[in-house]
């Protein structure tokens, strides 16, 4: 089943995955007490209640969350491989896209999702839970390898060319990927901005079990998302809390830049957050979109979504 079909068709009554006119698809819209809970965990809870249709819908949406993020990473790789300074580029952009297209279409979790649906039809709780877990593990392996690959390619560009060349690759990727993803951001309510932000980090499989758990704290003027660890650069640096795979000390900035939080040692994968969420909006005369604090460190990463975007301070969360 295509991921587009999953989020464009109506879901069963009681499912928290609801239609969004702004996004043109369904997205989880449950309350603050559960929005940061892994979609896998939510599906398991409905399985335990015998709510098979809702659990099956959540399993489909869980695969959609992970696929959406992996597809974003594939798009980023297309841009990197087509970049003239990458050292692996080929003439034109079509060839990198052809290379990535084969990988993008593989669908490592598709068979497991079919098995989950069959188990739900048979009301087999153990089988459904087991196949959701297997689906996550398969998707996580692809996700983590893509993050690792991007980190190493960007590190090579920085070493062979310049740190500014990495910034330029991220800007090109913004035009191909993130600009469209966040096109509706100005029209969204604060809660809608939170929903799409949390969805992305559930899809990155953040949290202490690498299954998509995100802390959410509502403050007077903003929402705080707590990623401990972030499922991408956090797992890269700190290791996989699920499998026990050790982290690494990722190569990163040797010079403090205004597009890297004026920090030295920000990993090359992680630096896109500073560029896309803070530096680029300010270059265009807008406030930071989603300021971060503690990104790519040994501790939690905090994201801030201000209820009044114009109140987001420049250069600080």
Pin down the residues of each PLM region.
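N-terminal accessory segment detector
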Residues: 2-271, 276-283, 287-300, 308-317
């Amino acid at each position: 089943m295509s991921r587009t079909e999953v989020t464009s068709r109506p879901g069963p009554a009681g499912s928290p995955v609801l239609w969004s006119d702004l996004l043109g698809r369904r997205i989880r819209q449950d309350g603050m007490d559960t929005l940061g809970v892994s979609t896998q965990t939510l599906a398991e809870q409905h399985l335990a209640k015998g709510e098979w249709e809702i659990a099956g819908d959540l399993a489909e949406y869980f695969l959609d969350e992970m696929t959406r993020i992996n597809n974003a990473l594939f798009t980023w790789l297309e841009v990197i491989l087509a970049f003239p300074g990458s050292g692996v580029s080929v003439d034109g952009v079509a060839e990198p896209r052809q290379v990535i297209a084969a990988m993008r279409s593989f669908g490592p979790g598709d068979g497991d999702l079919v098995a989950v649906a069959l188990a739900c039809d048979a009301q087999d709780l153990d089988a459904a839970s087991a196949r959701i877990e297997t689906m996550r593990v398969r998707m996580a392996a692809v996700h983590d390898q893509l993050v690792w690959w991007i980190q190493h390619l960007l590190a090579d560009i920085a070493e062979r060319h310049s740190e500014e060349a990495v910034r330029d690759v991220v800007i090109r990727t913004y035009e191909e990927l993130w600009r469209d993803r966040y096109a509706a951001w100005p029209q969204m309510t604060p809660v809608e901005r939170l929903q799409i932000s949390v969805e992305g980090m559930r899809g990155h499989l953040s949290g202490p079990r690498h299954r998509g758990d995100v802390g959410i704290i509502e403050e007077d003027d903003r929402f705080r998302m707590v990623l401990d660890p972030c499922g991408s650069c956090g797992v890269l640096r700190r290791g996989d809390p699920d499998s026990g795979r050790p982290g690494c000390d990722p190569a990163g900035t040797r010079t403090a830049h205004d597009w890297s939080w004026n920090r030295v040692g920000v990993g090359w994968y992680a630096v896109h957050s500073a560029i896309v969420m803070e530096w680029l909006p300010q270059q265009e005369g807008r406030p930071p979109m989603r300021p971060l604090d503690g990104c790519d460190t040994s501790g939690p990463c905090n994201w801030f979504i201000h209820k009044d975007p114009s109140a987001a301070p420049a250069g600080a969360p």
